[in-house]
């Protein structure tokens, strides 16, 4: 959750650059909503409960059986949070995607403890590749506000 809070801290600057943040989590929607409330996030946290998005980006992996056993021994049952029995997770990733759907920058690391600094994302948003077309700051849709996500 620390990464989401760090992104929340730079959200005003991101919006000034005409961008928005969308987080995608393998957790059930109810957990995503709870995280969003607890951290007072002003951006959407979407659920990828079957890891379909993670698979499409080549980020999904299955934990080796020894790690699954270790997780279970500590009482961490991913199926409770993710809603599926498989011990699969996405690699942490951050993408800068323009309005035409082109990935302008990507940061993916198999080591979940290594995350890009939000300042790096701000710098990527300041590049000419991002500013190929004029943009208006984006706001959360009324539908997402009504759903509480």
Pin down the residues of each PLM region.
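Thiol/selenol-based redox catalytic cores and closely related redox-interacting motifs
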Residues: 48-114
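Conserved redox-active cysteine motifs that mediate thiol-disulfide chemistry
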Residues: 1-9, 13
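Thiol-based oxidoreductase modules, predominantly thioredoxin-like and allied folds used
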Residues: 15-30, 43-50
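Short alpha-helix adjacent to the SAM-binding motif of class I
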Residues: 31-38, 56
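Cysteine/selenocysteine-centered motifs that mediate thiol-based redox chemistry or coordinate metal-sulfur cofactors
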Residues: 131-149
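Generic recognition of short, well-ordered alpha-helical segments
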Residues: 2-5, 34, 116
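A short, polar/charged loop-to-alpha-helix boundary motif
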Residues: 112-128
């Amino acid at each position: 959750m620390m990464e989401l809070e760090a992104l929340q801290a730079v959200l005003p600057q991101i919006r000034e650059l005409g961008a928005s943040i969308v987080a995608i989590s393998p957790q059930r929607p109810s957990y995503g909503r709870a995280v969003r409330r607890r951290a007072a996030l002003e951006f959407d946290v979407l659920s990828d409960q079957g890891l379909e998005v993670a698979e499409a980006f080549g980020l999904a992996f299955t934990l080796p059986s020894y790690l699954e056993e270790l997780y279970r021994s500590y009482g961490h049952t991913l199926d409770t949070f993710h809603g599926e029995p498989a011990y699969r997770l996405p690699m942490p990733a951050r993408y800068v995607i323009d309005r035409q759907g082109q990935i302008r920058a990507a940061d993916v690391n198999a080591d979940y403890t290594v995350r890009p600094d939000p300042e790096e994302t701000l710098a990527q948003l300041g590049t000419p590749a991002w500013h190929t077309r004029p943009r208006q700051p984006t706001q959360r849709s009324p539908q997402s506000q009504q759903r509480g996500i």
